[in-house]
Amino acid sequence: MRFLAVIGALAILVGIGATLFFFGGFYSVAGTAEDPAIVTWALTRVRTASINRNASDQPPASINISDAATVQAGAKAFAARGCANCHGAPGVNWAKFSEGLHPDPPDLKDVVGELSPAQLFWVVKNGINMTGMPSFAQAGVKDDEIWSIVAFLKKLPVSEADYKAWTVQPAPSH
């Protein structure tokens, strides 16, 4: 019985300590502060589990994400929507402001191989809370355009020349 009382008292003390730590302003939420490893681990686990649980959409029959025209449309959308500002692109440097994002935005060519098209679609459509990754759906981007971005992402890495050719806007006709 005494053992349970000690465990209970310790649990209460830990709870009070955690409450003071988090609600007393001792935990820094500054974008320049590194999270403790346990926080990074927990947030990464939660993010991965949420994406895995919720990502189930498949492209409609009208969209072939392996089609060259869809990939090119996705590259244009990626460029036009400002994705390269945070994630970079072949031959395109990240915007200076992206250095202030925490966690750092991933270099997509390094991570897209780990994610299925459904997972990429879910992330682009819904965004990732507390990372700076916006929800394209809330910005009014239609599913077809999001699927074209997914097609481009699944094609990464691509050459700088291909990216430039796919994203160059034609000169206005006179």
PLM-predicted stretches and their roles:
Residues R2-Q72, A137-F152, P170-H174:
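Periplasmic c-type cytochrome electron-transfer domains
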Residues R45-V46, A95-K96, F121:
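Short, flexible segments with low predicted structural confidence
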Residues T70, G91, V123:
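Short glycine- and Lys/Arg-enriched binding-loop motifs that mark or flank ligand-binding interfaces
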Residues Q72-A75, F121:
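Short hydrophobic/charged patches on amphipathic alpha-helices used for structural packing
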Residues G100-L156:
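Extracytoplasmic electron-transfer domains, predominantly the class I c-type cytochrome c fold
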